[in-house]
Structure formats: structure tokens, C-alpha cells
Amino acid sequence: MGKLTKNQKLAAEKIEAGKAYSLKEAAQLVKDITFSKFDASLDIDVRLGVDPRKANQMVRGVVSLPHGTGKQVRVLVLCTPDAEAAAKEAGADYVGLDEYIEKIKGGWTDIDVIITMPSIMGKIGALGRVLGPRGLMPNPKSGTVTMDVAKAVKEVKQGKIDFKVDKSGIVHTSIGKVSFTADQIRDNAKEFIATIIKLKPSSAKGTYIKSIYLSSTMSKGIKIDPKTVEEN
């Protein structure tokens, strides 16, 4: 391992080894230890006491973060011509159907979210090989297959994200930017964790929230005491 920079040393000194911080402390600390010239993303990792290999222990859901993610989300709407104007007005970056299906078949995936209608899903099924591995396949559970595409576009643009537990039992997502205030970071984290708690599978035994870590793109992970999440 190379030598630590001055900023990395300062950051390392601020985090006590093995200590679990309150969510309130962690929300401020992650700002204090991030030294970057760009507006770094903030990530949260929640390890769950579930076995994702079992269908009845899969944790998947949708959450609308109170302060958004701070990211510019590029949205493609695949819809019928009568819905195009509303989708564009709602803020979709790309709107159409057959021409975009052909582009995706050719490997184009320069987007973050695809929203479509139930009647279009038959055409999109063939794109699974391209979209599936990138997590771009529209899904009714995440609200990206809907008759009201305009409403879905607005929700995504305002900070609605979908998530699911990975094969290691961890739910990982971005909950903002380091430029957010500590209170905004805490609000977003609380909403995300509260949503995960509501989704606890009835078949999950033992401790459900095993650990929570908050970090930025440029920082070490800060361990959070799960019992402090609901504190004011």
C-alpha cells in the first residue's frame, strides 16, 4: 500500500477503529472526512440477516428520498405515441419506441432508468440480454412499468430509487452528495433504512439489520449503530 496523503491521514484520524457512530454523527463525519475536488456521491450499505438465495427472503423495494439523490438521472420512456408529449413534459430525456429498441439492440445503454407501459413489455422482452445485466429492465414492482409514464418520470427525477439485496445479503445504494447538509444526509438515510425495515421477510430469523456503513466515493466506511437511526 502506498503512502497516505495528508488528507487521507486527517480522515483516518477522525474515525475511531471499531467504533459504531450514531446516524447523526456519521452524517456530519462523512462530510468532514471527504476531501475531493468534485461533489462525491454518498453510499450506504446495509447488511441484512437474510438468505437471498431463498425466494421468500428476497428484499426488494422502492424508496423516494426526501432530498433526492443529487444525481442527474437520464430517463428513457418507451411508450405509445399518445403518451409521448406527457412523458417529455414530465422531464424524460429520451422518448420513443421502435427507434430506441433498435438502438438498445445495437448496444446503446447511455441511460439510468427505462420507463414503459404494460402493452409495450412484449417488445422489450427481447432486450433482456442487454438490459438485464445493467439493471435497466423495467419492472412493475419498481414502478417502471405503468400506464402513467409521466408520473413515473417525475418520481424518478425527484429521487425515487429502487433497490434489492445482493447475493451477499447487502443492500447498497447512493443516498446523496457530500454537498448535502448533514441533516439532509440523515433524512435520506433514515427514509432508506425505514423502508428496508418495513420490507423484512416474515421468514427471516434472528437479527435483521446486521450492520450499516456510510461512506463517500472518496472516504472510508463509517459504521453506524442501527439503534440510533430513529434518534432525532
Curated annotation (Swiss-Prot):
One of its GO terms (biological process) is regulation of translation. Pfam families: Ribosomal_L1 (PF00687). Part of the 50S ribosomal subunit. GO terms for molecular function: rRNA binding; structural constituent of ribosome; tRNA binding. This is Large ribosomal subunit protein uL1. Belongs to the universal ribosomal protein uL1 family. InterPro entries: Ribosom_uL1_bac-type, Ribosomal_uL1, Ribosomal_uL1-like, Ribosomal_uL1/biogenesis, Ribosomal_uL1_3-a/b-sand, Ribosomal_uL1_CS. It comes from Phocaeicola vulgatus (strain ATCC 8482 / DSM 1447 / JCM 5826 / CCUG 4940 / NBRC 14291 / NCTC 11154). It comes from the Bacteria. Binds directly to 23S rRNA. The L1 stalk is quite mobile in the ribosome, and is involved in E site tRNA release. GO terms for cellular component: large ribosomal subunit. Keywords: Repressor, Ribonucleoprotein, Ribosomal protein, RNA-binding, rRNA-binding, Translation regulation, tRNA-binding.
